[in-house]
Amino acid sequence: TTSSVQYENDDVMRPVWGDDYSICCCVSATQTGKEMQFFGARANLAKCLLYAINGGKDEKYKTKDGKPMQAGPEYAPITSEYLDYDEVMHKYDLMMDWLAGIYVNILNLIQYMHDKYYYEAAEMALIDTDVRRTFATGIAGFSHVVDSLSAIKYAKVKVVRDENGMATSFVTEGDFPRYGNDDDRADDIAVWLLKTFLKKVKKYHTYRNSEPTTSILTITSNVVYGKATGALPDGRAAFTPFAPGATPSYGAEQNGLLASLNSVAKLPYEYALDGISNTETIAPGALGHSEDERKNNLVHVLDGYFDQGAHHLNVNVFGLDKLKDAMEHPEKPEYANFTIRVSGYAVKFIDLTREQQLDVIARTCHEAM
């Protein structure tokens, strides 16, 4: 089964990490015995976009008197009926500056306290004394930010506000290019977002002079981050799961598997050395009629994807009906060891929470190449 393994590109990792590297965490490479990583969760760039629109006020959390909480810097909110791309980008850039600063500062505190109270002396004794340290950061809500900015740029996005003047939802008028369709108009925004946030993170001092890196990898926390984030201009409903990692948003991919892979392959690995996790679900029939034909076609798909410089791919080959049946009838013997790739790791489907199972079912299942 393809879901029991993940595929990573040695051609992009070997020049960075050398011949003797290992995969740690989920998809991240590391020089074996020579380095360690300060792990750092993710920054919710989708929520950051809403902060830019709402002047740093939180769309979910309230003060004791029921007013929106001023969680970010008190910048002037956007008050126009329709979102202007240049205005949004200016405010978003400022809000990302603030987020990168507070993100790195908090991670510095966490790593300092971890070393103070739970230093991993036994593990460090097995590593070279001249240790290379990387400072891991990450991005959550990636595809939704890309599609939201694309909607603002190429369509008309009307803001729906509540009695407090908070943007609570958006009405998009017209079509716009979405990440995951091999359309450079959207994919260029994706590349910009990745490069920009890492550059902002690198402006700040990191604990023990570690090297800042980033990832587009959320594991199953895409569900948790989504729970805290309101509606977005790309059409994602409030407090629903994000697409995981660098995977395009659910339903955004309209041109088949290859177009989706081509979009993700444009993300430069050197700007996300902790990993660019991509999880794709493919209906068996999309790969061919016979088992041999499917294997052969999948090999060609992987070769084409990785030849473009892509970093990582999880492949699930099954139909959605099987997932739905497994969710409703977990007692069936055939599902006891039914394993899927969620994001950076493999798990038995019946061991996921129902909320996580529904998230997996909601993902795009490619019916065509």
Question: Language-model segments: which ranges?
Answer:
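Conserved catalytic cores of very large enzyme subunits
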Residues: 1-369
